[in-house]
From Swiss-Prot:
GO MF, one annotated term: transferase activity
InterPro entries named among the record's database cross-references: ChyE-like, Class_I_gatase-like, GATASE
GO CC annotation terms, alphabetical: cytosol
Keywords: Glutamine amidotransferase, Transferase
Keyword Transferase attached: yes
Name of the featured protein: Putative glutamine amidotransferase-like protein YfeJ
Domain Glutamine amidotransferase type-1: 1-200
Length: 239
């Protein structure tokens, strides 16, 4: 299977998604847009598209960030959805999926940084690929915004600070506002790059300290993500 990663910043890690793909021997390709790497020309280049997070918004312009082309990424997402590829968006990536499908990004009720529980909705509890997450499940977070909802979208998980943590947009299309891919190394990269943001955010409701983030064990969350990815891949192969 061919997995393509779109990464927006050097400090945004593919984390547990990369380990999953490597451990299963899948073919991995990259668009590290911060380094000038191009997006795939079309959806024929991959079976699964994973679009990661970043400090940008789907509304960020080329003038504001020359290496981030929101329109081009949304076009690629639309191509992938039309071609019935697996599409997963994380944080900014989930917001790009919503925008690509016509649903505007919006501000989350709360800023969340660190690890906090998500709760499965009734749809999530019944979902064959999500129900094994259990409810509640503590996962990683680092965001201000949340994805828009199309008429066909289904919210599968929410948190106290954000009502759109996991959204299904189609049979093989999922947006994760939360970060189940976080590892100790991935979080450390964000911490090192975000000193001022963390200092400014301390005291807000859903902000962990640096010490708490460094000490938390991300393994259980990663394992539940890997099972979701395995089951999604199996379902896609049987379509």
């Amino acid at each position: 299977m061919r997995v393509h990663f779109v990464v927006h910043e050097s400090f945004e890690s593919a984390g547990a998604y990369l380990k999953w793909a490597e451990d299963r021997g899948y073919t991995i390709s990259w668009s590290r847009v911060y380094a000038g790497e191009a997006l795939p020309p079309n959806a024929d280049e991959f079976d699964m598209l994973v679009v990661f997070g970043g400090p940008q918004s789907p509304r960020t312009t080329r003038e504001e960030c020359p290496y981030f082309d929101s329109r081009a990424e949304q076009h690629l997402i639309n191509q992938a959805v039309t071609a019935r590829r697996m599409v997963i968006g994380i944080c900014l990536g989930s917001q790009l999926i919503g925008e690509a499908l016509g649903a505007a990004v919006c501000q989350s009720p709360e800023k969340e940084i660190g690890h906090y529980p998500i709760t499965l909705t009734e749809a999530g509890l019944r979902h064959p690929l999500i129900a094994h997450f259990g409810s509640p499940l503590t996962v990683g977070h680092w965001h201000n915004d949340m994805p828009g909802l199309t008429d066909q979208a289904t919210v599968l998980a929410e948190s106290e600070g954000c009502p759109r943590q996991i959204v299904q947009y189609g049979n093989f299309v999922y947006g994760f506002q939360c970060h189940m891919e976080f590892t100790v190394e991935a979080v450390e990269g964000l911490i090192q790059h975000s000193q001022q943001e963390l200092a400014d955010a301390q005291g807000k409701r859903f902000i962990r300290s640096v010490a708490e983030m460094r000490a938390w064990n991300y393994q259980q969350m990663n394992e539940k993500l890997w099972r979701f990815l395995d089951e999604l891949t199996l379902a896609h192969s049987q379509k």
